[in-house]
C-alpha cells in the first residue's frame, strides 16, 4: 500500500480529488457509481510511438465496453489535469512508455492495457506489469503486441536517440531490419531496441479487441481483490558460488547473481 499512499500524497500536493471513488470494498453503492460514470483513458502521443489509427481504436473501445473514452496527452495538458482524469478511470490504454508510470494513480480495480510495437516482446519489458501487480495496487494488467510487420512505420533516419539507425554500419543496419524480435539487452541505448520502440503502430483492431476480451475475463471483482498477493523476483541469472579457505579452521562461501530484470 506504500505506493498508493505515495500517489495519494502527490494528489493532495496537486490539490486533486479522485474523480470516482472506487477505493472502497465491494458494495451496491460502489457498483452504482461505476455504472454511472465509468470511462476509459487513452494516452495520445503526437511525436513518437504514435497509434496511427487512434480514432478507430477509441471507437472500438467505446463500442466494446459501451462507456465513454477520453484521451490525455502529456504534450498538450498539464500533469495535474492528466492525473485528475486517470484517477477516476476504469481502464488506461497506452503504448509502452514512461507515461505509464501514471498508472499508479488509477483507482483499485482498474485495468492497465499496454501496447507494444512490432518485434518488442512484452515478456521482456515488465516495469508497468510489475507495478500493476504489486501488493495493494489491485490493478488488472493486459498487454497487446503488434505481430504484423506491415502494420508498423519505422523511422531509420531519425536521430539515434529516437530510434534512427543511419549512423550504424551497413551490416548492423541490415541485421536490425531483418530481426523480428529484439533480443534481451540492458536499458536503454541499444540501437535495435530504440529503433523498434520508436516505431509508429497501426493497431490491428480485431486482435486488440480479442486480447481485451480474453484479458478482462480474468479480471477479479473488487470483492475478491486481496492485498495479500505475492511478488516474485525475476529468474536468477548467472549465479556464482565461490569458496575461500583462509585457515584450516576458517572458510568463506560467497554466492552472487545478476540483478533481476524486474
What is each model feature region?
Residues 1-260:
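The feature primarily captures lumenal catalytic ectodomains
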Amino acid at each position: 500500500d506504500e505506493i498508493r499512499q505515495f500517489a495519494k500524497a502527490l494528489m493532495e500536493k496537486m490539490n486533486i480529488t479522485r474523480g470516482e471513488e472506487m477505493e472502497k470494498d465491494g458494495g451496491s453503492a460502489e457498483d452504482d457509481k461505476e455504472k454511472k460514470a465509468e470511462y476509459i483513458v487513452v494516452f495520445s502521443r503526437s511525436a513518437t510511438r504514435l497509434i496511427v489509427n487512434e480514432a478507430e481504436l477509441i471507437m472500438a473501445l467505446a463500442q466494446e465496453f459501451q462507456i465513454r473514452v477520453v484521451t490525455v496527452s502529456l504534450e498538450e495538458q498539464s500533469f495535474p489535469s492528466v492525473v485528475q482524469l486517470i484517477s477516476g478511470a476504469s481502464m488506461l490504454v497506452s503504448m509502452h512508455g514512461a507515461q505509464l508510470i501514471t498508472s499508479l494513480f488509477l483507482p483499485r480495480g482498474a485495468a492497465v492495457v499496454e501496447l507494444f510495437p512490432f518485434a518488442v516482446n512484452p515478456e521482456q519489458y515488465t516495469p508497468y506489469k510489475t507495478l500493476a501487480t504489486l501488493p495493494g495496487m489491485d490493478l488488472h494488467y493486459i498487454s497487446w503486441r503488434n505481430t504484423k510487420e506491415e502494420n508498423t512505420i519505422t523511422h531509420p533516419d531519425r536521430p539515434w536517440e529516437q530510434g534512427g539507425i543511419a549512423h550504424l554500419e551497413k551490416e548492423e543496419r541490415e541485421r536490425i531490419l531483418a530481426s523480428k524480435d529484439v533480443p534481451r539487452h540492458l536499458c536503454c541505448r541499444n540501437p535495435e531496441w530504440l529503433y523498434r520502440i520508436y516505431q509508429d503502430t497501426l493497431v490491428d483492431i480485431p486482435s486488440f479487441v480479442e486480447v481485451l476480451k480474453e484479458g478482462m475475463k480474468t479480471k477479479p471483482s473488487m470483492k475478491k481483490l486481496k492485498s495479500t498477493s505475492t511478488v516474485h523476483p525475476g529468474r536468477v541469472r548467472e549465479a556464482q558460488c565461490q569458496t575461500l579457505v583462509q585457515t584450516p579452521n576458517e572458510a568463506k562461501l560467497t554466492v552472487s547473481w545478476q540483478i533481476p530484470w524486474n
